[in-house]
């Protein structure tokens, strides 16, 4: 799903980013995900600031962990893993995605909104009696910057769900190898010269 979102909606996002920077960011993100998953599955707190921040966020927002790396699919063409599923009630759940970006740009926020909305669509498709309550990013970071200061971020960012019909249109366009006409994109500036 993330590759399709990248291809259809954000094809130029990483064009000017050094590969070593991308690899370092991916390694850091993978390590944070693994630490948090170990806490949720095994109650193992590895002592990292990110896990401590995650525990605090769960307490502050009343998050009741239901599943990590939960696989969702349309049972035909698409499958992906939801970072975190939290139980709200017997039939209601919220979905969280862990991000470790240094800066949460508007583009990254919109990308996560699409990702979470597609996850919500698939989750409800595969769990007919379930409904999704909230979608949010768990933004965690604790890295030393080049100047020696610590880049410490621990926040929850709620996103508005994109309607399932629009999510389906995106998926169908990609399957047909067509460009998706994003109804949420901001038009290019027009020059009057």
What are these regions (language model features)?
Residues 66-172:
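Mg2+/Mn2+-dependent nuclease catalytic core
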Residues 1-79:
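Metal-dependent nuclease catalytic cores that hydrolyze phosphodiester bonds in DNA/RNA
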Residues 178-187:
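Charged phosphate-binding loop/patch that engages nucleotide di/tri-phosphates or the phosphate backbone
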């Amino acid at each position: 799903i993330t590759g399709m979102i990248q291809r259809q909606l954000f094809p130029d996002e990483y064009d000017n980013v050094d590969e070593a920077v991308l690899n370092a960011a991916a390694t850091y993100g993978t390590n944070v995900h693994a630490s948090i998953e170990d806490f949720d599955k095994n109650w193992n707190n590895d002592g990292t600031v990110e896990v401590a921040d995650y525990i605090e966020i769960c307490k502050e927002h009343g998050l009741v962990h239901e599943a990590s790396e939960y696989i969702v699919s349309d049972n035909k063409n698409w499958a992906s893993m939801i970072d975190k599923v939290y139980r709200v009630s017997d039939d209601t759940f919220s979905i969280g995605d862990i991000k470790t970006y240094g800066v949460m740009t508007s583009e990254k926020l919109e990308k996560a909104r699409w990702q979470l909305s597609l996850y919500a669509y698939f989750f409800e498709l595969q769990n007919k009696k379930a409904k999704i309550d909230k979608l949010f990013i768990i933004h965690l970071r604790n890295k030393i910057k080049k100047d020696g200061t610590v880049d410490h971020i621990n926040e929850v960012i709620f996103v508005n769900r994109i309607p399932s019909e629009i999510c389906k249109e995106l998926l169908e366009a990609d399957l047909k190898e067509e460009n998706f006409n994003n109804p949420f994109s901001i038009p290019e500036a027009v020059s009057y010269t």
